[in-house]
């Protein structure tokens, strides 16, 4: 059984990470949450909450899923950034551009070809992370037939 940490530090992270939590538990693996400076909006249906760094280290996740561009680098497991928005180019060339590489992630999960291409180019340039086009966890379920 693999273990996955769902790292949330913005309120919108709940909607992005819950579909991943569902997929993790449906395949028989274990998930847990860590909330950083946001209100606890977890429900009974959600995986357990780890409230300390020590608890995260004891949980020892294989991977940490993160919808934002920051995660503590001392958390165990590979760091996976999960994309959730469109790149509309509004911050191109700035420190906050869509494809900014901060050196924190081992894998970038992109939602579509445009973003994937940008990150594949950066992966080739920097050489310390991989890119996988995985879809959009928040919207993909809405597009599935019932």
Which residues does each PLM region occupy?
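Active-site and donor-binding regions of nucleotide-sugar-utilizing enzymes
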Residues: 5-145
